[in-house]
Structures are given as C-alpha cells and as structure tokens.
Amino acid sequence: MNKLHLVLLVLLVIAATVCTPLVFAEGEIPADVSLETLDYIVDHSAQYEKLRQAKIDSCKALIASSDDISKSGLYNQLFGFYYGFQSDSAITCARKGLEYARKCNNKTDEISSIIHLATLYQVTGCYFDSKRLLDNLDHSQMNSSQLYDIYSCYANIYDALEQIACDSILAEEYTANYNSYRDSLLTIDPENVFFRTGILVDKGRLVEALQTMKPYCDSLDVNDPIMGAAAYVVSGIYREMNKTSLEKEYLIKSCHSDLMHANREYISLTRLAEILYEEGDIVRAYNYLNRSIEDASYCKALQRMDMAAPMLSIVNTSYKRMNSRWLKFLSGISLSLIHI
C-alpha cells in the first residue's frame, strides 16, 4: 500500500468512527428515544413533513369539492394542519374560513376563525394586534371550546409580554393578567394536568408538580403528538430542580415528538442544544440550533427565533474553532503519514 492510500484509509477510518449515522427504512419512524434517533429525525425531516403535507393535500381536495356552507368548517380544519407548520398558510386558512363563515352567516365558525387569526398573530409576535381581535369578541356568544381557546391566547400573549417587558411594574401587571386567564382556563377544564402543574411550579411545589405531570407524560405513547408539550413541561421541572441529566432525557423526548410530527413551533430543541454545548457536544449543539432557527423562521415564530439566536452566535463561534482545530489535526496526521 503506497503512502497516499494509507493516508486516505486513515482519514476514512477517522471519519467513519466520528460520523457513523443510524439508518432507517424510508418512512420509518424510530420508536426509541435517544440522541442518535434524534440526529436521524433532524437529518431526515423531509420524510416526516411529507406525512403532514399529505393530510393538508387531502383536506384541500375536500374543500375544492365542497359547497360554501361546508367550507368555513373545513378551512378551520385545514388551519389545524398548518398551525405550527406554515404560519403564512395558516393565516390564509383562517381568513378564508372567516370569509365563508360570514358569507353563510355561520357565527360559530366566524368566531373560531377570528380566534385562529389572533392565535397566529400571537405566535408571530403581533401581540397587540392579537389582543385587539380578541377584545372585540363577544364572550357570551362563545361555546366552552372557544372560551378555552380565547383564554389560552390571552394567557400566551401576557406570558410573552412579561418576558420582553423592560419595566418591572409592567412585568408584574402582565404576570397578574396571565395568572388570571390561567385561572379562567381551570374553571373550564379543572382537571387539565398542564395548568395544575403550572400552578404548582409557580408556588415552588416542584415535587408535587413532578408527581402530577410525569406519570401523565410517561403514560403517553412516543408517537402521541401531545408528548412534545408534556415532556417539555417535565424537563422544565427537572431544570428547576437542577437535575440536568433528567431534564436532558425529557427534552430529547419532546424534540423527538415535535420533529416527528413536523411541528416547527417549539422550544425544546433550543434548550437541548444549550445543554449539549455546555457538555462539549459542539457539533450536535450547532446542528440543533441551526434547525431551531430554520424552523422558527419558516413558521415565523418570532419568540422562538429570539430565544435561539443569542445561543447560536456563541455555538457558531465554538463550532468554527473546533473545525479549525480538527483540520489542523487531520493535516498533521497527513503530513506524518506522508513522511513514513
């Protein structure tokens, strides 16, 4: 074997050792939850997005063959498929649903479409536009499901405003409003495990919060779309407890679920990348943060982009330094072998 072949062989062995990926069949959804399977899902997101797109295409075909009376409800259904996936398209669906609801004098669907618009405005950072739409609605005309949605939207608006408030008095006001709407949600759905857990966390009763949420999360199938949110809440409790390894375990579960269901409006992957960076796993942290930014940008989830962007700058610098050292290392090996 000549020197050049020996150099190439050594470099290939090193590359294979560092970069060997998991391989799954086309369309297969890996059931085990680990960083390795998460790597696969991140790298092969297109196949999971195809599954969601198929539902969208099916609903579009149904709308095309339906009468005007049915279209407002079908557009609201299509909104659900686009929500968390493509915000621009979701807004279009909400507007089309509103148009047909008003055309057919369907008050229930009209209210649902307005709430959908307000929800999208909140996700994309238009908090006061969202609130303006909600403030103009007559709550007496709403069913319990619509009240639940409107209170959820109000709560999310005030939660987001509290996080960006530059005035402590304003922040306290936003927090009080958030708590008020969360309490209203509990009157509608007193058994809601998410809200009950949130109240326990706010009171510092972390063990009780964990005992409330963790069994529920662990009972979910790994393919259940609720897993993303449930696992993230559990990870947050472990974070408050300073139990990073357990926080990381549930963040991986949350990311697995969100990405597998092509949900682009998430936060778990950003937090997981932060932990991986602190552990020295620079390559994964870099890849995960880039994916977070891309998804948030595509979905126009402004708050998610704001959360991920500062961390990306730090990780990006470390990634470039690591690559520079890696190239120097490979060059050193090459030169050593050439002189054998």
Regions found by a protein language model. Name each.
Residues 1-8:
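Bacterial N-terminal signal peptides that target proteins for export
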Residues 8-18:
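Bacterial N-terminal signal peptides
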Residues 19-321:
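A "functional boundary" signal
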Residues 184, 332-336:
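Short, intrinsically disordered, charge-balanced linker/junction segments flanking boundaries
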Residues 316-333:
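Membrane-interface helix-start motif
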Residues 338-340:
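Conserved small/polar residues in nucleotide/adenosyl-binding loops
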